[in-house]
Amino acid sequence: MAKKELAKIKLQIPAGVANPSPPVGPALGQHGLNIMQFCKEFNARTQDQKGMIIPVVITAYADRSFTFITKTPPAAVLIMKAAKIDKGSGEPNRNKVGKISIEQVEEIAKLKLPDLTAKDLDSAKRSIIGTARSMGIEIK
């Protein structure tokens, strides 16, 4: 018989540096999960992506066990890294804060493709371009 699923917890945690402090501790603690075990497993799985924010979906089961799936970093984080900026524009239609090339857009789209609802690379690229424009970043 399959385990009874208690909850799905979605978090965004910096890669390789998960610790029991908020937001991880309270989110897992309220479901009775072993926080340190999760932190060790997450850090081991993401140590090659240090510095990136990694979305994770944790499935908690009734017997207090858990499984988790790591996703690709958010598109906005990848775009900011490619444009070498700290944050997007407050007024994206007026103030442009950076530029990225079509090649960089394609690279980000290839990386994000498994997590996007896009059917092919072209629609994934359009999605990434839309995100970049809404952040005040020009595509050259």
From Swiss-Prot:
Question: What is the recorded name of this protein?
Answer: Large ribosomal subunit protein uL11
Gene Ontology MF terms in the entry: large ribosomal subunit rRNA binding; structural constituent of ribosome
**Cellular component GO terms, alphabetical:** cytosolic large ribosomal subunit
Q: Give the organism's phylogenetic lineage.
A: Bacteria, Pseudomonadati, Thermodesulfobacteriota, Desulfovibrionia, Desulfovibrionales
State what this protein does. Answer: Forms part of the ribosomal stalk which helps the ribosome interact with GTP-bound translation factors.
Name the Gene Ontology biological process terms: translation
Q: Does the keyword Protein biosynthesis apply?
A: no
Keywords assigned by UniProt, alphabetized: Methylation, Ribonucleoprotein, Ribosomal protein, RNA-binding, rRNA-binding
Q: How is it modified after translation?
A: One or more lysine residues are methylated.
